[in-house]
């Protein structure tokens, strides 16, 4: 069954990375002001990154998310091909925003004297995976498998585009409740992917690998696999496996729900204490538990449409 669906999912894997030059304005064309293009709605959320509001694009009533980031809160900067200095988040989003549907798209951005404003796509109706699990509890393995496959494809797409997300967690995954499609969001902790070691980390500590807790060093790909293991455990058990540094370093996984032996094996493999013992993305997708993956629309029809949608964001 899985092999018959690979072609249906192939567009996710082969989507091209965005050419940063492609979004430049034509010579002599000035960008219209933010206020004339977008109508700002209620606050969706706020934190150390700034604030995110719902909004509407005036030209076509397209739902958008409007993210305000204060300049004095930006710790990592990047540069566009034309030399413009922007938050690294803008650089990363431009690299991954393409025809691939599993990563949130950056539609536009604006610079203000004291902040940057990012215009992002906003599916409707939508709920993040954290709220979805909080309301419904541990997911059935069939649903968890579909969700996990989509997240894995999103992370693979990012890596193929040279981007390391560094904050893979349930709060940063949106579920389109109509289509059954997941989208990876919030690249504010991300970095350009490299083969050498990282010595900085701004993501969520309980999703971070033991090598970061112990040595403040990690490699991007193996750290991402650890976070994916935490996420899969969260899906099938309803909560994360570790809360404290000592638990992360010890790495002992106890299952609070009935979980199949194949799923347990995959989780424990992703959560191997030695980074070199963790699977590659390809090995995860070839794992026995990852076979017979539902397509997003099948997921919506079987698991989502029969449920009452949670509150939209």
From Swiss-Prot:
It comes from the Eukaryota. GO terms for cellular component: cytoplasm; nucleus. InterPro entries: Kinase-like_dom_sf, PIM1/2/3, PIM_Ser/Thr_kinase, Prot_kinase_dom, Protein_kinase_ATP_BS, Ser/Thr_kinase_AS. It holds the Pfam family Pkinase. GO terms for molecular function: ATP binding; protein serine kinase activity; protein serine/threonine kinase activity. The modification Phosphoserine is found at residues 8, 98, 261. The keyword Cell cycle applies. The modification Phosphothreonine is found at residue 23. The keyword RNA-binding does not apply. Interacts with RP9. Interacts with HSP90AA1, this interaction stabilizes PIM1 protein levels. Interacts (ubiquitinated form) with HSP70 and promotes its proteasomal degradation. This is Serine/threonine-protein kinase pim-1. It comes from Felis catus (Cat). The lineage of its organism: Eukaryota, Metazoa, Chordata, Craniata, Vertebrata.
């Amino acid at each position: 069954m899985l092999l018959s669906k690979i072609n249906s999912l192939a567009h996710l894997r082969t989507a091209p990375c965005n050419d940063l030059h492609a979004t430049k304005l034509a010579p002599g064309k000035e960008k219209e002001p933010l206020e004339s293009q977008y109508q700002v709605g209620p606050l969706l959320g706020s934190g150390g990154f700034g604030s995110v509001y719902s909004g509407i694009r005036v030209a076509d009533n397209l739902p958008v998310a409007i993210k305000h980031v204060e300049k004095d809160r930006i710790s990592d900067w990047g540069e566009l091909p034309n030399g413009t200095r922007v938050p690294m988040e803008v650089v990363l989003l431009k690299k991954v925003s393409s025809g691939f549907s599993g990563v949130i798209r950056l539609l536009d951005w604006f610079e203000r004297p004291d902040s940057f404003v990012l215009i992002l796509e906003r599916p409707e109706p939508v709920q993040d995976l954290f709220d979805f699990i909080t309301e419904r509890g541990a997911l059935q393995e069939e649903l968890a498998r579909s969700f996990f496959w989509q997240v894995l494809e999103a992370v693979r797409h990012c890596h193929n585009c040279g981007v390391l997300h560094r904050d893979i967690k349930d709060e940063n995954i949106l579920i389109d409740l109509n289509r059954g499609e997941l989208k990876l969001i919030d690249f504010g902790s991300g970095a350009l992917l490299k083969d050498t070691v990282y010595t900085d980390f701004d993501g969520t500590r309980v999703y971070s690998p033991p090598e970061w807790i112990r040595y403040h060093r990690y490699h991007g790909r193996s750290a991402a696999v650890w976070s994916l293991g935490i996420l899969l455990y969260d899906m099938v058990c309803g909560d994360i496996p570790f809360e404290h540094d000592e638990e992360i370093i010890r790495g002992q996984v106890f299952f609070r729900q009935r979980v199949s032996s194949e799923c347990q094996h995959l989780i424990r493999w992703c959560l191997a204490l030695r980074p070199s013992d963790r699977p590659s993305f390809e090995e995860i997708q070839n794992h026995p538990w990852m076979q017979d993956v539902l397509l997003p629309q099948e997921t919506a029809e079987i698991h989502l449409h029969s449920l009452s949608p949670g509150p939209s964001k």
